[in-house]
């Protein structure tokens, strides 16, 4: 129970469609190092805490990677998907404290993978409703649409 622990790709092997394998492994090392400092001479407890902390994030990076694969495979040529991304970008530029695009959350913040996945799913539900707006392709950059997104937050 206290003689070995898996970190990096051996602990959370995933498809390569988010490019986060090495980053996730470095994060494992940082967190494990902090836990070693806290759990002096109690490796079993250290390993248990590490697993409790990292398992949800290993699952999160897997979910994010599979989602990104599906997006790259199925959606990048879809005009409605591209419009949705333009709307999200505009809202994020106007209200960066209220909306961080999923890719930016994962790649440029310290938000955990599991939390980014949850927030990304919430954002997707909001955008699903926004994209159902009549004539969204004509009014996408209007204040009305920005207020609609804000009202869901």
Model-derived features with residue positions:
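FAD/FMN-dependent oxidoreductases across multiple families
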Residues: 1-42
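C-terminal helical "tail/cap" subdomain of flavin- and related membrane-associated enzymes
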Residues: 34-153
